[in-house]
């Protein structure tokens, strides 16, 4: 098992990326391959590939194709050639997404790959797709997202995943025309597997196993959840601090429970999002990822390798399309 990491991708590159890779190397099996300028990646105790160029966070998407010696391009190239089993990058979404679709290639029958992320819910995890790759989509694309989300959810352990369409209300007639059209298509293709419209709060409640959205709405929902998680933990800390001795004593007695809650709410624990619908495992880590987030992103990639997520999605899409009922 080999997982390549873009050492130069992200706001905190290269230091936090290197720290995260070293942390992950102690917890994952197989090799972690560093990709970046030789003077930065050598002598770190991990295999490396020298890359002289960098795709910057503000670079337009096409730069990933132009900069053939960049860490991002070379990582995707290694993946497409089968020399690594997964590629992780905290680099800019646009270039990474274009590179994944152009260099690694799209799965047959998928017009628009999407970002899929498993976010914590009261029932375990909810797959949110698309989490930020496609700002504007057609209703037909949302059906493809549902197929990929179902397959991903099954990989996570759901036996009969149910799908919800993110909307401004639960009623069937809510939302703009494209969403109404998507509702009808999902109802037609998925049958009883389609739950109907869901709202933002349903994602963390676990009302459904898969929430389908355009990339703009999905990304806003994801970032809102991240902010809410930080708010909850910050308010809890302040309340304990302001509550005096008894509050501090109670917090000490409940430290293990609080730590578990904090870990579950910590956005860094999500690790990263899969670019679903391409022929290899590509994980997009948050642009502001620190070492902990990078470590978890690499572990997400490891899990994708272990469960053969690309093959499962390919098989799941074929099965769902043929069955027409989402199972």
UniProtKB/Swiss-Prot annotation:
Keyword entries, A-Z: Cytoplasm, Lipid biosynthesis, Lipid metabolism, Phospholipid biosynthesis, Phospholipid metabolism, Transferase
Matches recorded under InterPro entries: FA_synthesis, Phospholipid_synth_PlsX-like
Reactions listed under catalytic activity: a fatty acyl-[ACP] + phosphate = an acyl phosphate + holo-[ACP]
SUPFAM superfamilies to which the protein is assigned, alphabetical: Isocitrate/Isopropylmalate dehydrogenase-like (SSF53659)
A GO CC term assigned to this protein in UniProt: cytoplasm
Described purpose of this protein according to its UniProt entry: Catalyzes the reversible formation of acyl-phosphate (acyl-PO(4)) from acyl-[acyl-carrier-protein] (acyl-ACP). This enzyme utilizes acyl-ACP as fatty acyl donor, but not acyl-CoA.
Protein's UniProt name: Phosphate acyltransferase
Underlying gene: plsX
């Amino acid at each position: 098992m080999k997982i390549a990491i873009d050492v130069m991708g992200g706001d905190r590159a290269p230091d936090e990326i290197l720290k995260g890779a070293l942390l992950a190397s102690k917890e994952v099996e197989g090799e972690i391959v560093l990709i970046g300028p030789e003077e930065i990646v050598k002598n770190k105790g991990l295999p490396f590939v020298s890359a002289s160029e960098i795709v910057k966070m503000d670079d337009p998407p096409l730069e990933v194709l132009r900069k053939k010696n960049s860490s991002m391009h070379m990582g995707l190239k290694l993946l497409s050639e089968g020399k690594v089993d997964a590629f992780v990058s905290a680099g800019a979404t646009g270039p990474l997404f274009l590179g994944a679709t152009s260099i690694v290639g799209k799965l047959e029958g998928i017009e628009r790959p999407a970002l899929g992320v498993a976010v914590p819910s009261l029932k375990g995890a909810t797959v949110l797709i698309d989490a930020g790759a496609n700002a504007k989509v057609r209703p037909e694309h949302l059906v493809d997202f549902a197929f990929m989300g179902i397959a991903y959810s099954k990989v996570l352990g759901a036996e009969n995943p149910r799908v919800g369409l993110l909307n401004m209300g639960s009623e069937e007639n809510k939302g703009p025309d494209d969403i109404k059209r998507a509702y009808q298509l999902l109802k037609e293709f998925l049958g009883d597997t389609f739950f109907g419209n869901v709202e933002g709060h349903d994602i963390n409640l676990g009302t459904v196993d898969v929430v389908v959205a355009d990339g703009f709405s999905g990304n806003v929902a994801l970032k809102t959840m991240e902010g809410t998680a930080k708010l909850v933990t910050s308010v809890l800390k302040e309340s304990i601090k302001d509550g005096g001795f008894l509050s501090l004593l109670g917090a000490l007695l409940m430290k293990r429970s609080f730590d578990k809650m904090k870990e579950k709410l910590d956005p860094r624990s999500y690790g990263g999002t899969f670019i679903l619908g391409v022929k290899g495992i590509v994980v997009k880590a948050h642009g502001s990822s620190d070492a902990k987030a990078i470590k978890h992103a690499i572990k997400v990639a490891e899990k994708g390798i272990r469960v053969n997520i690309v093959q499962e999605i390919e098989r799941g899409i074929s099965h769902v399309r043929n069955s027409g009922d989402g199972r």
